[in-house]
Regions:
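Terminal (and in a subset, N-terminal) low-complexity or junction segments at the ends
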Residues: 1-338
Length: 338
C-alpha cells in the first residue's frame, strides 16, 4: 500500500491519520523508511510502536541497519532481542542478518545461522545457501564456504560468484580460476560480479595476460559491459606485474569514469618498481579525486625520497599542511636524506 506511494510524505501523512494502526500498517511504514535509506526514521517509528512488533518488523529494521557502515552490531543486537521476545526467525531474517555478520566478521553467528537453518529445514533455500557461501568466504572460512557450496542442489550465479570471490580474496587465486572454469562447464552465465572475482584472482596471482583475456571475454563471450571496478582490477593486474605503462594506457582509454582505485593501484606499483614519471601523474590525479586522503601524499613523498628527490618529498608534506590534510595515525613519512 505505502510502498506504491511516489513520496514518503504522503504515506506518512496517511499513516498519521489512521486512528488504530495494526502491525501490518506499522510494518508498511517502517519498511518504506528502510527501503528509502531512512533507517533512523524507521528506528524512531519502531521505538514508539504501541503494539508488539512481529518478525516482519524486526526483519525490516535488521536489514536496514545491516546496510549502514556502523549498523552491523546494532543489527545483531536487535536480532538477539527478537529471539528474547520469543519470535521465530525466518529465511528473510537470516538473509537480513548475514550482511551484518560479514560487516563485523561474526563467524560464530554465521555458524549459528547455518545450524539454525539446518534444524529448521530451511538450509536448502538457494538464496540462503549463497549468502552463507559469501559470508563464510568473506570471513576467510573457506572450508565451510566450500562445504556449503558443494552441498547445494543447484548452484546459481550468486553462489558461483561468491565462491570464486572467496578464493580470490584469500590467496587461492588459482583455485578461484579453476572454479570459474567449472562454472563455465556447468553452463551458468557469469555476471559482472563473477568477473570481478576472476580479475582479482588474476591480479593476485600475477597473471596479467589472463586478466587481459578474461577482461576481453566479458563482453565478447558473455555480453557483460565493463564497469569502473573491472577496469580498476585490470589496471591492478597489469601494475602488479610491472607493466605500468600498459596499465596507464588502460586508464587513459577507459570509456568510464576513472576512479581512485585505478590510480591508486598504479601509484602503489610505481613505488614498487621505482617509476617516478607515472607516479607523479597518478599522484596528481589522486589529489584531484581525493584531495583529503593523506595516504596518496605520503605514498608519493616516499617515492620521491626513494629516488633521492628529497625536496619534492618535503614539498608534498608542505602541500598537505597547506590543504589542512593530516596524516593518518600510525603512518610515517619515512623520508631519509643521505
Amino acid at each position: 500500500m505505502y510502498g506504491k506511494c511516489v513520496s514518503i510524505l504522503p504515506a506518512r501523512n496517511l499513516f498519521d491519520e489512521i486512528p488504530q494502526r495494526n502491525v501490518v500498517v506499522w510494518n508498511a511504514m517502517i519498511s518504506l523508511y528502510t527501503h528509502s535509506n531512512r533507517v533512523p526514521d524507521a528506528l524512531k517509528l519502531f521505538q514508539v510502536m504501541d503494539i508488539a512488533p512481529n518478525v516482519s518488523t524486526y526483519n525490516s529494521i535488521i536489514a536496514g541497519l545491516a546496510e549502514l557502515d556502523d549498523g552491523s552490531f546494532k543489527a545483531i543486537a536487535l536480532y538477539w532481542k527478537m529471539r528474547e521476545m520469543g519470535l521465530i526467525p525466518n529465511v528473510i531474517t537470516l538473509l537480513a542478518l548475514l550482511p551484518a555478520c560479514i560487516g563485523v566478521a561474526a563467524l560464530n553467528l554465521i555458524k549459528e545461522i547455518q545450524s539454525y537453518a539446518i534444524r529448521n529445514d530451511i538450509d536448502s533455500h538457494p538464496q540462503l545457501s549463497s549468502g552463507l557461501v559469501e559470508a563464510y568466504g568473506r570471513c576467510g572460512c573457506l572450508v565451510n564456504a566450500h562445504t556449503v557450496f558443494w552441498g547445494m542442489k543447484e548452484r546459481d550465479v550468486v553462489a558461483w560468484s561468491s565462491i570464486i570471490s572467496a578464493y580470490a580474496l584469500h590467496g587461492k587465486a588459482r583455485t578461484a580460476l579453476e572454479m570459474f572454469q567449472q562454472m563455465e562447464l556447468a553452463k551458468v552465465q557469469p555476471d559482472g560480479i563473477t568477473f570481478l572475482g576472476v580479475l582479482k584472482a588474476c591480479s593476485h596471482a600475477g597473471l596479467a595476460d589472463k586478466a587481459i583475456d578474461y577482461f576481453a571475454r566479458m563482453r565478447t563471450d558473455y555480453g557483460v559491459e565493463a564497469s569502473s571496478d573491472h577496469y580498476s582490477c585490470l589496471v591492478d593486474a597489469l601494475s602488479r606485474a610491472g607493466r605500468l605503462y600498459e596499465a596507464y594506457q588502460v586508464i587513459r582509454e577507459m570509456p568510464v569514469k576513472v576512479t581512485a582505485k585505478a590510480w591508486g593501484a598504479l601509484l602503489g606499483a610505481c613505488r614498487t618498481y621505482g617509476e617516478l614519471e607515472l607516479a607523479e601523474i597518478a599522484g596528481k590525479a589522486l589529489s584531484e579525486i581525493e584531495p583529503d586522503n593523506p595516504a596518496n601524499y605520503v605514498l608519493l613523498a616516499r617515492i620521491y625520497a626513494s629516488q633521492g628527490r628529497h625536496e619534492e618529498a618535503e614539498r608534498m608534506r608542505s602541500e598537505m599542511k597547506e590543504k589542512g590534510v593530516k596524516a593518518a595515525p600510525g603512518s610515517s613519512w619515512i623520508v631519509y636524506q643521505d
